[in-house]
A protein has these predicted regions:
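Conserved donor NDP-sugar-binding/catalytic core segment of glycosyltransferases
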Residues: 100-149
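Short aromatic/hydrophobic "clamp" motif used to bind/position activated sugar donors
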Residues: 88
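Short, acidic, metal-binding catalytic loop of nucleotide-sugar glycosyltransferases
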Residues: 22-31
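A conserved acidic beta->alpha catalytic loop
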Residues: 23, 38-49, 95
Length: 272
């Protein structure tokens, strides 16, 4: 595998995006590009993102569309359409990664598999502290996170420990649950086979689960990324979930349609 494309979704939180990008800039593995996928932010976030385009140690591109509510799947499709890598890593702009994040995902990548990683949630109070002090969590030793866990500033600890696991990474090949696009690795060719995210999922909810279900229907299997590629997820208030029930109903209808693979309104509309 050569170039990896890291697609960072963001919306109106420049302070979080700064922390996310800074953690990507110190990666041990430099053979990747960053695509900032902006879901309609205002000028402040836009200027922050554009500023980093000139400061990044790796290739960094920025794509933005009009704010018409939560359309993360749409902006991710647009980002994939312009990316140059053969492997995709989806993360959110309110996530902080460790210095070996790219390297470990590269080690886990295997043809015919997608790789969901795990996340460690920060408390609301500690998130505020991290942002105000601009803490470089990616540079902290494991002892620091043990202390955070004891103080209940993070919700779990064991995700930070690397375990080889071996064949245990393959024991649930068709599991779609808890595979989220805040930390998900997919071969670009597999993403294109299923036509990416289905933009019929409007508003918050289940567009990532739908993607994974269609990957499984297409014969792409799950390789577990837990205990290898954790991310730190900053606390934020919940998104508007007014469309959640509609999206969930659509997801359940598709779950048992094993021949439903290709998104009805997907990435193909942005590719010549």
């Amino acid at each position: 595998m050569n170039l990896i494309s890291v697609i960072v979704t963001t919306y109106n939180w420049p302070a979080a995006l700064t922390l996310c990008l800074e953690s990507l800039f110190v990666q041990q593995d430099k053979n990747f590009e960053i695509i900032i996928a902006d879901d309609g932010s205002s000028e402040n976030n836009l200027e922050t993102a554009k500023g980093y385009c000139t400061d990044s140690p790796v290739s960094l591109s920025y794509i933005h569309h009009e704010d018409k509510g939560f359309r993360a799947g749409t902006i991710r499709n647009k980002a994939v359409a312009i990316c140059k890598g053969e492997y995709l890593l989806f993360i959110d702009g309110d996530c902080i990664v460790l210095p070996d994040f790219i390297a470990k995902h590269r080690q886990l990548a295997l043809r015919g598999f997608f790789v969901p990683g795990n996340r460690v949630l920060l408390s609301q109070e500690y998130t505020q502290e991290v942002i105000e002090k601009r803490l470089a969590l990616y540079a902290k030793p494991i002892g620091y996170f043990i202390l955070l866990w004891l103080q209940k500033k993070i919700n779990r600890l064991f995700g930070f420990f690397y375990l080889p696991l071996g064949l245990l990474r393959y024991v649930q090949p068709n599991k779609w649950q808890k595979a989220m696009t805040c930390n998900l690795g997919i071969w670009k060719s597999d993403f294109l086979i299923v036509n990416g995210f289905d933009e019929l999922f409007e508003g918050w909810g289940y567009e990532d689960s739908d993607l994974v279900i269609r990957l499984v229907h297409a014969g792409i299997k799950r390789k577990e990324g837990r205990f290898a590629v954790p991310i730190l997820h900053l606390w934020h208030s919940q998104n508007d979930k007014s469309n959640q029930d509609i999206n969930y109903q659509r997801l359940m209808e598709r779950l048992n349609k094993l021949d439903f693979i290709i998104a009805k309104k997907g990435v193909s509309q942005y590719i010549d």
